[in-house]
Amino acid sequence: MKESVIRKLEGLLERNEEVLALLGDASVIADQDRFRALSKEYSQLEEVVAGFKAYQQAQADLDSAKEMLEEDDAEMREMAQEEMKAAKAELERLESELQILLLPKDPNDDTNAFIEIRAGAGGDEAAIFAGDLFRMYSRYAEANRWQMEVMSCNEGEHGGFKEIIVKVSGEGAYGKLKFESGGHRVQRVPETESQGRVHTSAVTVVVMHEVPEAEAISINPADLKVDTFRSSGAGGQHVNKTDSAIRITHIPTGIVVECQDQRSQHKNRAQAMSVLAARIQAVEDEKRRSAEESTRRSLVASGDRSERVRTYNFPQGRVSEHRINLTLYRLNEVMEGDLDAILTPLMQEHQADLLAALADEQG
């Protein structure tokens, strides 16, 4: 392992010990915000520190085995050869693990996520598939013990959704779901198709991270145009009698957000503002990402809706993930929420890209 990497790991080990000592300090325990922040830092350091300690032990085992090679006893030398072989293999394994643990982490990975699903080309069939994707994400959220909340929806005439925005709350939600942004294409025979012909439809998905209130971009109220209107969604007669639905337009960017899922205008406005903040932040994030990643590709889609990321072929039971040339013949399982079969290889490829970039930087 490079000396610069060893020094970085030694610094993290030292910081881990400092944080542990601080967590036992009475003044820190009395300050809930600081205690919470240090506890989070300690848990983030724990895995890499444990890996580095194991690496140090494997290095000590290797050094010890090398000393045993100097023994006169042939049996001891043979044993030393075996121990050296095992220690070298362990060092290689741990070095690979530590390299991944040291990769720069997206600070937003642990935040909640907003998913926008919009029907594109394909009319009714696209809206129906948007509903299928919503169900797929709901199942995936359930498997991860995340909470899903519908922020806004516009139902399709024959089922599904023309557009639906949901909030996914839970640890690591954005970190996993961010890979879903992009164009999703479906190929299947619609129920209304009497000739059995396969139709192609498109749905776009945009995933954004929730912006914590403390970090939210300052939005000037003068830049907002707020309209109220009567909700057209479900919710009972009360909804249709009052102008509880909200449409907010951010004039500088042209971003428009509608929320009509709640009975209360106040709640709809609060939800619309949180989605608006996420959208504005997403625009800023993309500007930064474009500047940082202009020299290398990224598997995390920019939200460019023309970028096709995945095709779902129902007649063949096939899912094709175009970004990494992955083909799976387990469409039913994926549509039932088994997204890890796709997301895990995507994350691994993303890590490989980051490692390659890191190697280039280190020369």
UniProtKB/Swiss-Prot annotation:
- Keyword Cytoplasm in the entry? The reply is yes
- Chief subcellular location equals cytoplasm
Q: Where is this region: Disordered?
A: 284-306
What name does this protein carry? Peptide chain release factor 1
Q: Which GO terms describe its molecular function?
A: translation release factor activity, codon specific
Spell out the subcellular localization from the entry. Answer: Cytoplasm
Similarity section? Belongs to the prokaryotic/mitochondrial release factor family.
What is the recorded function of this protein according to its Swiss-Prot or TrEMBL entry?
Peptide chain release factor 1 directs the termination of translation in response to the peptide chain termination codons UAG and UAA.
Residues that bear N5-methylglutamine: 237
Question: Per the record, where are the segments of Basic and acidic residues compositional bias?
Answer: 284-296
Q: Which UniProt keyword terms apply here?
A: Cytoplasm, Methylation, Protein biosynthesis
Native species:
Shewanella sp. (strain W3-18-1)
What's a single GO CC term here? cytoplasm
PANTHER family assigned to the protein according to its UniProt record, in alphabetical order: LD18447P (PTHR43804:SF7)
Has UniProt tagged this entry with the keyword Iron? Answer: no
